Every structure is written in structure tokens, then in C-alpha cells.
From Swiss-Prot:
Domain of life, per lineage: Eukaryota
Gene Ontology CC: peroxisome
Family in the record: Belongs to the uricase family.
EC identifiers of the protein: 1.7.3.3
UniProt keyword annotations, A-Z: Oxidoreductase, Peroxisome, Purine metabolism
Motif (Microbody targeting signal): 301-303
Function description: Catalyzes the oxidation of uric acid to 5-hydroxyisourate, which is further processed to form (S)-allantoin.
Binding locations of urate: T60, D61, F162, R179, V234, Q235, N261
Catalytic activity from the UniProt record: urate + O2 + H2O = 5-hydroxyisourate + H2O2
Source lineage: Eukaryota, Fungi, Dikarya, Ascomycota, Saccharomycotina
UniProt GO MF annotations: urate oxidase activity
Record: active site: K12 (charge relay system), T60 (charge relay system), H263 (charge relay system)
Stated name of the protein: Uricase
Length: 303
């Protein structure tokens, strides 16, 4: 049988570091970034697969060392800047590398208050919430950059409804005008290259605070809408969230949400003569709903 290699990529996964940034005016005033990096290369590596010829391979250990050295010697805030630095480095250094994929997952460490003000160098790790960026960059100059919030777990004990849905002979779900709504937020926004510029302009956008500002806006919109909207459905609420982000962030091309609907079932205590007025629930580990959507701006109609 005749075969051919149709695609390949390789690199280093789970490269972890924590970097401390000290204020030049007050070294005790510090910021920290804990991150996990994946960096994958593609290009002229076919013979390493098809002919067992390793001469073209940049060892994955070299990829790991490069990530750590650049984390030490360059500015890494925000993570979109560092992703662009890594991607351009590998394309510039190795002529046979035609494309680079970089994913950076940043843990959420937040300063906590002591005597009413944030402490200079003490932090709380806020659960499993992550800030993420993904960059795919090609030697031709084409790239796709996205940013995300993941595993931001939220719950509200009222202010959510679900009724008026399709019913058939398989339907057992009862309509409700008052229920618990809980989810693990996974929100991703894709940047508009026309607004950002080339991959080398990502650093300029970072200097202007664009990436941090949109991250903060997306997080605030998500939390505020979740809290204040009397949600008719997860579908309607996530569409409203995405629309608001697009209205605020002119440099964003699209916004996607993936929201699991984590179920809490009312516990029946009638056997004990007790009415359960939406007070005691069972947190169901599985199964759960999963709702996804992507929202983009409407193209302007040409006259």
C-alpha cells in the first residue's frame, strides 16, 4: 500500500513557569504571572517522519528552553504579546519552519487586601479560572489570534426561567419561571487582523492596553449580564453577552461562548411533610446541557 504524509506538527506541551515583575521604584511591589505554554512547529520536517531523518528536527527540549529564556528576557504581559514573540522567534530563527502555534494559559492570581488596601506582593489564586490566548502564525504573515476566559464558575439562585420549549413524547422536563442557573464560562473572542495589523503590531496593541481592556470588558459583561438579566434561556443570555462585547470592542471580529448548563434538582421532601420552596437542591454531576454560539457583526449592506 502506498501512503503519504498529509500533515504534521510537533513541539513542547505543558511548559510551566511563574514570573515575578518588580516595580523599579519599589522592588517590594510586585506582579506575578503563572502560565502554561504549548508551542508547536510545522514546516520542512517531512523526512523525519517518512525517512527517519532527524536532521531537520528542532528538539522539543530546545523549544522548551526557548520558551523559558524568552520568558526571562522579554516582556510577557499580556500573554498575547508573549505568544507573538514566541511565534515570530521560531519563524525568524529556523528557515524551514513555516508555521507556529502557540497557546498560553494564565492562572488568575489576584492581590488581596490587608488593612483595606491590596498587599504589594501577596496573592489569592482564584479557583480554576484561566485567561488564554491562541496564536497561529505562518511565514507568509497570515495569523489568527484569539483570547479567552475559561472555567469561570458562576451560579445564581434565582433570576432564570425556561419555558415555551418544544415538547414531544420524549419530553419529561417541566417548565419553570424560577430556577438555579450555573455554568463554567468558556468565552473566546477572535481578533480582527485588519484592526490589529501584522503579527508584529500585536506588541503595539499590547502597549495601548487593548488586550487587557477587552479581557476586562468581556469578563465584566459576562458577570454583569449573568447577574442582572432575568434569563429566559442560556441561549438568549449568551447571545446578549457576545453582542455587548462586540459593541464595546471594535478590534474583535467574533465572540464565541460554550456554556454547560449545570443542573441543580429540587429535592422532594414531601414524604416528610415538608414543602421545598426552591431552598434545597441536589447538585447533579451529570449529565449537563451544553450550549454554544458564535456571534459576529453584520456586514454593512452596500448601496
Amino acid at each position: 500500500m502506498s501512503t503519504t504524509l498529509s500533515s504534521s506538527t510537533y513541539g513542547k506541551d505543558n511548559v510551566k513557569f511563574l514570573k515575578v515583575k518588580k516595580d523599579p521604584q519599589n522592588p517590594k511591589k510586585q506582579e506575578v504571572m503563572e502560565a502554561t505554554v504549548t508551542c508547536l512547529l510545522e514546516g520542512g520536517f517531512d523526512t523525519s517522519y517518512t525517512e527517519a531523518d532527524n536532521s531537520s528536527i528542532v528538539p522539543t527540549d530546545t523549544v522548551k528552553n526557548t520558551i523559558l529564556v524568552l520568558a526571562k528576557t522579554t516582556e510577557i504581559w499580556p500573554i498575547e504579546r508573549f505568544a507573538a514573540k514566541l511565534a515570530t522567534h521560531f519563524v525568524e530563527k529556523y528557515s524551514h519552519v513555516s508555521g507556529v502555534s502557540v497557546k498560553i494559559v494564565q492562572d488568575r492570581w489576584v492581590k488581596y487586601a490587608v488593612d483595606g488596601k491590596p498587599h504589594d506582593h501577596s496573592f489569592i489564586h482564584e479557583g480554576g479560572e484561566k485567561r488564554i490566548t491562541d496564536l497561529y502564525y505562518k511565514r507568509s504573515g497570515d495569523y489568527k489570534l484569539s483570547s479567552a476566559i475559561k472555567d469561570l464558575t458562576v451560579l445564581k439562585s434565582t433570576g432564570s426561567m425556561f419555558y415555551g420549549y418544544n415538547k414531544c413524547d420524549f419530553t419529561t422536563l417541566q417548565p419553570t419561571t424560577d430556577r438555579i442557573l450555573s455554568t463554567d464560562v468558556d468565552a473566546t473572542w477572535v481578533w480582527d487582523n485588519k484592526k490589529i495589523g501584522s503579527v508584529y503590531d500585536i506588541a503595539k496593541a499590547a502597549d495601548k492596553g487593548i488586550f487587557d481592556n477587552v479581557y476586562n470588558q468581556a469578563r465584566e459583561i459576562t458577570l454583569t449580564t449573568f447577574a442582572l438579566e432575568n434569563s429566559p434561556s442560556v441561549q438568549a443570555t449568551m447571545f446578549n453577552m457576545a453582542t455587548q462585547i462586540l459593541e464595546k470592542a471594535c478590534s474583535v471580529y467574533s465572540v464565541s461562548y460554550a456554556l454547560p448548563n449545570k443542573h441543580y434538582f429540587l429535592i422532594d421532601l414531601k414524604w416528610k411533610g415538608l414543602e421545598n420552596d426552591n431552598e434545597l437542591f441536589y447538585p447533579s454531576p451529570h449529565p449537563n446541557g451544553l450550549i454554544k454560539c458564535t456571534v459576529v457583526r453584520k456586514e454593512k449592506t452596500k448601496l
